[in-house]
Design a protein with these regions (language model features):
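Elongated, amphipathic alpha-helical interaction scaffolds
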Residues: 1-298
């Protein structure tokens, strides 16, 4: 039997690769850990027409956990390695995370091969895709670049990693949704959960969304088979998304407050340097106390 291209990149560590189904699983990851669904998603993203799920090999690393985060799905097809990530919040740090993940993938693939030989060690071509369905408005397609994180970058970066982000909220990327029924129905399910959370508790909203989807034949077989697990994961995902929103809001407000305070201090210093107003008048204008103004004079 002829060797498939991806068979050349089998991990050298037994039991090191499989679909990620245990670490803080999500509905998206659970859906697309199924090779048939994953192949359909790959075909839609890449405008391909593969029909045999065995052409695709899932190689998600079970032990690739960094700072409490884990790669969602990794797979090889032909000589290409794809890292798929699902995000429900805006995250410009995905290129750095993917850099960690891809390094670990390559390390496993080449574990018993010499990197000191005179022969070039071939590796599958990496591709990085993020599927975003957060509530912050974003374009249908955009990119995150690792070089955006480099401080004092001069000229072209010597290292780059580009993550293509696809907005998979309902109403976005119509052509992609048209070619992947599972992705389209997943977007419909998420939209229903969000709609119902406006009027009822999260638990009730998720159960109502699941029931309605089954009734409308949206992911019906999947939801019937995995009802309890989907409800539990959806509640966890939504709670996590809301907590991350609160954290970002707090960080923004703290930064905004800090910026306002700096502006007040700069104004006070300028007025003191002009020496046109009394300390009392400057205090009234800036809201700073006399003692604070005296410290600025020192």
């Amino acid at each position: 039997m002829a060797m498939r291209p991806q068979d050349r990149y089998k991990s050298t560590t037994a039991g090191a690769v499989s679909a990620n189904r245990n670490y803080k699983d999500t509905v998206f990851r659970m859906l697309f850990s199924d090779k048939k669904n994953l192949l359909s998603l790959y075909n839609a993203v890449n405008s391909r027409d593969y029909t045999n799920p065995d052409d695709l090999e899932i190689v998600t690393l079970e032990n690739a956990i960094y700072m409490g985060m884990k790669n969602d799905l990794a797979f090889i097809i032909d000589t290409n390695l794809y890292l798929y990530e699902h995000q429900s919040t805006y995250n410009p740090n995905m290129p750095l995370r993917d850099l960690f993940y891809i390094s670990s993938e390559y390390q496993k693939m080449l574990d018993q091969k010499s990197l000191y030989s005179s022969s070039l060690q071939k590796i599958p071509t990496p591709n990085f895709i993020e599927f975003y369905n957060g509530s912050d408005p974003v374009c249908d397609v955009f990119e995150h670049r690792l070089s955006s994180a480099f401080e004092h970058l001069s000229g072209e970066p010597k290292l780059e990693l580009i993550v293509t982000v696809l907005n998979i909220n309902e109403g976005h990327n119509a052509l992609l949704m048209e070619h992947c029924k599972t992705l389209r129905e997943y977007a419909q399910y998420v939209a229903k959960v969000r709609k119902y959370t406006a009027d009822m508790s999260l638990n009730e909203a998720v159960e109502c969304a699941v029931d309605e989807c089954i009734k409308e034949n949206i992911l019906a077989d999947f939801l019937r088979k995995n009802r309890a697990e989907v409800i539990s994961m959806s509640i966890f995902e939504y709670d996590k998304e809301e907590e991350e929103k609160k954290l970002r809001k707090a960080e923004y407000e703290a930064g905004e407050k800090s910026g306002i305070q700096k502006a007040v201090l700069n104004t006070a210093r300028h007025l003191l340097e002009l020496n046109l107003l009394s300390l009392e008048n400057i205090s009234r204008a800036t809201g700073l106390s006399i003692d604070e103004l005296k410290k600025l004079q020192q």
